[in-house]
Regions:
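PLP-dependent aminotransferase-like
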Residues: 16, 49-106
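Structural detector of well-ordered beta-strand residues that form the stable sheet scaffold
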Residues: 34, 58, 79, 136, ...
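N-terminal small-domain helix-loop-helix segment of the aminotransferase-like
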Residues: 1-41, 45
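Active-site pre-lysine segment of PLP-dependent enzymes
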Residues: 72, 90-99, 112-135, 139-172
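Short, well-ordered alpha-helices that flank and scaffold nucleotide-derived cofactor binding pockets
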Residues: 24, 48, 52, 69-73, ...
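Short N-terminal helix/helix-N-cap motif within the alpha/beta-hydrolase-1
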Residues: 38, 44, 62, 114, ...
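PLP-dependent aminotransferase class I/II
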Residues: 13-14, 162-208
Length: 208
């Protein structure tokens, strides 16, 4: 009854209860969590916030199809890093980094190839990235991986300002139609995303 009586009102910009629940579930800092209308909204606003004309954004050959779409909408230049036998090749990503590079989109684990990049390779990639380049670590399928060499990206976020981990309720939780995703990032990234994120992007039904 309480929910139905509030359907005539706009949803809150941030659901403190949901953020707290996510932070508790994954042992994260609640102040570094941002909600989105699916993680695809977060991908779009990352491109809007951090890319402009002539900027370059690297994405992998068989990564999420929304990566190049978000780059194009932002007016930036998409740079493809070739995979090796349907697996992300870290050396190919590093080789594509230039002075114009602003973002790197990386899905780990990756759909549709079903492959993942091990921890030591992710750490090597991050060490090769200039501090002003943002690594977007899409961990939408992290719950499907039980392997000692896999990391979901949260450890990198806790230690560095230029990483954002993306997660979703669409896959493991089977709630794709609710359009609910979230990101975990530094305050610097979060503040810039909030500047371009719509005030009512996540609906109330998704947040309860």
């Amino acid at each position: 009854n309480n929910f139905s009586s509030n359907l005539n009102r706009y949803p809150p910009q941030v659901s403190k209860e949901l953020v707290e629940a996510i932070a508790k579930r994954y042992n994260l800092d609640r102040n570094k969590i941002i909600l989105g209308n699916g993680s695809d909204e977060l991908i779009s606003i990352l491109a809007q916030a951090f890319l402009g004309p002539d900027d370059e954004c690297i994405y992998t050959e068989y990564g999420f199809l929304q990566f190049p779409q978000a780059i194009e909408i932002a007016g930036a230049v998409g740079v493809i890093a070739k995979d090796n036998h349907l697996t992300v090749n870290i050396d190919n990503i590093i080789a594509k980094i230039t002075k114009k590079t602003k973002l790197i989109f990386l899905a780990n684990a990756n759909n549709p190839t079903g492959t993942f990049v091990p921890k030591e390779e992710i750490i090597r990639l991050h060490k090769s990235i200039p501090s002003d380049v943002l690594l977007v670590y899409d961990a939408a399928y992290s719950e499907f991986i039980i392997h000692p060499d896999y990391i979901d990206g949260s450890e990198l976020v806790n230690n560095y300002e230029n990483v954002i981990m993306l997660r979703t309720f669409s896959k493991m939780h089977g709630l794709a139609s609710l359009r609910l995703g979230w990101g975990y990032c530094s305050n610097y990234i979060l503040d810039n995303l909030m500047k371009v994120r719509g005030p009512f992007s996540v609906n109330m039904l998704a947040m309860i």
